[in-house]
Design a protein with these regions (language model features):
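Extended, Lys/Arg-enriched charged tracts that mediate electrostatic binding to polyanionic substrates
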Residues: 72-86
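Helix-start/capping segments and mature chain N-termini
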Residues: 1-62, 84, 91-190
Length: 190
């Protein structure tokens, strides 16, 4: 119960998907990049860095043990993979943990956009920030996502599919569009 992941948010995570191709082969997009981002987060929140080789070994193992749960190509679904590192240890007080646990779990998931790829209305909500400047916004930690729960629910209640977050300092520039990429086009330039 007395662990830094529960009390102070010392945890990091990644998210990958395994897709079965038409040829039956399983594919994952750039897992080395996820390993590198997890290492960046670990440095930022004072957790040990998991070597890329260990990350990839764990990924291979979790896929091998769960190969029967990777949906068929025709389904459009995938196997979601969640690598996670948490700070443990018996301590209360804001400081790095004395122990850490790395784990990976998987779950089959359907297509992210249930109605396919099409334009979707999104809300700009100036009263909310997804991440604070000079804080943990550059790291993949849960605290950055819990901050978006209220604005996300409000956007859905107003009929929008998601929130476009503006920069926290000036509220002038697009900072993030959670579930998708954002492209702005004016005339013939973007």
């Amino acid at each position: 119960m007395a662990s830094t992941c529960l009390h102070y948010g010392q945890q990091s995570f990644e998210g990958l998907k395994a897709f079965r191709g038409k040829d039956g082969k399983v594919r994952i997009f750039r897992p080395e990049e996820n390993a590198a981002r997890m290492q960046h987060t670990s440095r930022g929140i004072l957790m040990p860095e998991l070597p890329t080789e260990r990350f990839l070994e764990a990924l291979d193992m979790v896929l091998r043990l769960n190969k029967d749960f990777i949906p068929p190509y025709e389904s459009g679904a995938s196997l979601y993979i969640r690598p996670l590192m948490i700070g443990l240890g018996k301590q209360v007080g804001v400081s790095p943990a004395s122990e850490y646990m790395f784990l990976m779990f998987v779950t089959p998931v359907g297509a992210y956009f249930k109605s396919g790829f099409r334009p979707s209305p999104m809300a700009i909500m100036r009263g909310y920030d997804r991440a604070a400047p000079l804080g943990t916004g550059q790291y993949k930690v849960g605290g950055n996502y819990v901050a978006s729960l209220r604005s996300g629910v409000l956007a859905h209640e107003m009929g929008y599919s998601a929130v476009i977050y503006l920069d926290a300092k000036e509220k002038l520039y697009i900072d993030e569009c959670g579930p998708a990429n954002f492209f702005g086009i004016r005339g013939k330039s973007y």
